[in-house]
Amino acid sequence: MYQINNKTWSIRLVRSDSPMLIRSDGSYTVGMCDRTTQTIYISNLLQGKFLRKVLIHEICHSAMFSYGIDMSVEQEELFCDLIATYGDEIIGIVDNVFRALKEVA
């Protein structure tokens, strides 16, 4: 369990054929963030770097829901994909620039 903006979220690993992983179009996905139950469902078949990427993506959704950030589904997916794919690189660059600025100051 974790909290974002005083909202408690839980993460559950579920079978890959769980109804919790069915999209609105009837297809299966590997991760799903349910704003109603404040639960993230992740396929128990995931591991390693892909599991981490899916967790980042779904936790990004939970942050958006917790802070009331409203976007179209397409925009929200693009944003969560951006953070899940490039977030480590962006934060690493910021950390390096921040350290360099502190050394100059």
Protein language model regions, located:
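Active-site recognition of the HExxH zinc-binding catalytic motif
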Residues: K53-F65
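Metalloprotease/metallohydrolase-associated module, dominated by Zn2+-dependent proteases
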Residues: M1-F50, S66-A105
